[in-house]
């Protein structure tokens, strides 16, 4: 009926800085996918470096995604996470996890601070 509305297949790529637990980003990514109730493609590749970034972009492209959410489940690696936007041919939105589960030992990810660095790095690209 409405042919002028784009058909969006949204993908979710989680990123993680290697000095933080990778499982923190993966757990938080899974929680987002669960809340989205199947309306989101979950990329199984967690990006910590440039090689992971290339694998993740190839994965979401192969899955037919035409828009992305790049999710900082913890601080995140500034260069690889921002290169996702360069290599993915479509819109990318960057979001960061909130600290809120009370686990300040294994659950602290400093994603807000990572988002500040990410924003600065995106501005340089």
Task: Enumerate the language-model features and the residues they cover.
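An N-terminal assembly and electron-transfer interface module characteristic of large anaerobic redox
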Residues: 1-125
């Amino acid at each position: 009926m409405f042919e002028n509305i784009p058909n969006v297949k949204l993908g979710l790529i989680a990123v993680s800085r290697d000095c933080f637990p990778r499982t923190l980003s993966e757990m938080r990514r899974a929680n987002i996918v669960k809340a989205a109730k199947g309306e989101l493609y979950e990329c199984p590749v967690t990006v910590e470096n440039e090689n992971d970034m290339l694998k993740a972009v190839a994965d979401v492209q192969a899955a037919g995604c035409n828009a992305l959410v790049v999710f900082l489940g913890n601080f995140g690696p500034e260069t690889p996470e921002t290169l996702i936007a360069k290599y993915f041919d479509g819109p990318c939105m960057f979001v960061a996890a909130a600290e809120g589960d009370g686990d300040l030992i294994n659950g602290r990810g400093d994603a807000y601070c990572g988002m500040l660095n990410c924003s600065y790095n995106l501005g340089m690209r």
